[in-house]
Design a protein with these regions (language model features):
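A short helix->loop->beta-strand "cap" motif at the edges of active sites that frequently abuts
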Residues: 34, 55, 113-117, 142-144
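Substrate-binding/gating loop at the entrance of the active-site cleft, primarily
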Residues: 16-20, 24-27, 37-55, 64
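Conserved core segment of the aminotransferase class I/II
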Residues: 139, 144-203
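Short, intrinsically disordered, charge-balanced linker/junction segments flanking boundaries
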Residues: 1-5, 78, 82, 198-203
Length: 203
């Protein structure tokens, strides 16, 4: 649907909501002292999750003059030799801002130039109206340096069921799954069946 294709055997991890996916991705990628760029306003758990794994959160405030979209200039100004990960969420909560393909292509150039990894929280992707949602992971050379997070809470109004999806390179998903299996084991069976019904129902 969003031009993303992953091997379900080793490139997809089912999590207890996208929130667990955020935590797992950060813990798999971030070493103590690494800087993580966080686009704000942001989901409440982003910065605490960065801090819990020893990372240093660096805020990138979105500007109304840019329609709350992240620009390549804003991103470039925050990058240092310690920067490792860019954490973004578009469509954004609470601004509702979306990143169009041209916006993401400009961000892609900066990410590649500085060898960054991207965690992209796309939980609101299904709530994009009037235009097709574009994932930065679908752009050339970005597949191998992105973890895409999504879930069922927003698209299917299943907040309490705690069902999330993390998709990315097999090596990263492998390390995320190692943490997942010793902390959570698995998402609830009943929730998985409910999610399957949501995905396959003709309604």
């Amino acid at each position: 649907k969003f031009d993303l294709h992953y091997d379900r055997a080793d490139e997809i991890l089912i999590t207890m909501g996208a929130s667990e996916g955020i935590d797992l991705a950060l813990r798999a990628l971030v070493d103590p002292g690494d800087e993580v760029l966080v686009v704000e306003p942001a989901y409440v758990s982003y910065i605490p999750c960065v801090e819990l794994c020893g990372g240093i959160p660096v805020s990138i405030p979105l500007q109304a003059k840019n329609r709350f979209r992240l620009t390549a200039e804003e991103l470039g100004e925050k990058i240092t030799e310690r920067t490792k990960v860019l954490l973004i969420s578009f469509p954004n909560n609470p601004t509702g801002a979306i990143m169009e393909k041209a916006d993401l292509e400009a961000i892609r150039e900066v990410v590649l130039a500085h060898d960054l990894f991207v965690i992209t929280d796309e939980i609101y992707a299904e709530l994009t109206y009037g235009k097709k949602h574009v994932s930065i992971a679908a752009l050339p050379d970005m597949y191998e340096r992105c973890v895409v997070l999504n879930g069922f809470s927003k698209a299917f109004a299943m907040t309490g069921w705690r069902m999330g999806i993390a998709a990315g390179p097999a090596e990263v998903i492998f390390h995320m799954n190692k943490i997942h299996q010793f902390t959570t084991m698995s998402a609830g069976t009943t929730s998985q069946y409910a999610a399957l019904e949501a995905l396959t129902s003709p309604v």
